[in-house]
Amino acid sequence: MKLKSKLFVICLAAAAIFTAAGVSANAEALDFHVTERGMT
């Protein structure tokens, strides 16, 4: 059980890092789309 929860936390951290990397890589494009859509 402990190993599974640890693995889950690691997966969450990896996903967060991957998302942050993608956001920073496409920051300008994302910012433009968000502004265009009026943050809906």
Swiss-Prot record:
InterPro entries xrefs: PhrC_PhrF
Impact when changing T40A: Does not stimulate expression of the srfA operon. Reduced inhibitory activity. Strong decrease in sporulation stimulation
Gene Ontology CC: cytoplasm; extracellular region; host cell
One matching Pfam family: PhrC_PhrF
Chain residues in the propeptide: 1-35
GO aspect biological process, one term: establishment of competence for transformation
Post-translational changes noted in the entry: Secreted with a propeptide domain, which is cleaved in the cell wall by the secreted serine proteases subtilisin, Epr and Vpr to produce a mature signaling peptide. Contains a predicted signal peptide cleavage site in the N-terminal region, however the propeptide is probably subject to only one processing event, at the N-terminal end of the mature peptide.
Family designation: Belongs to the Phr family.
Protein function: Signaling molecule that serves as a cell density signal for both genetic competence development and sporulation. Secreted during production, but the mature peptide acts intracellularly, indicating that it needs to be imported into the cell to function. At low concentrations, CSF stimulates expression of the genes controlled by ComA, a transcriptional factor that regulates the development of genetic competence. It includes the srfA operon, which encodes a small protein, ComS, required for competence development, and the surfactin biosynthetic enzymes. B.subtilis is a well-characterized soil and water saprophyte, but it is also found in enteric flora of many species, including humans. In this environment, CSF can be transported into human intestinal epithelia via OCTN2, a host cell membrane transporter, and can induce cytoprotective heat shock proteins contributing to intestinal homeostasis.
Protein name, UniProt field: Competence and sporulation stimulating factor
Gene name for this UniProt entry: phrC
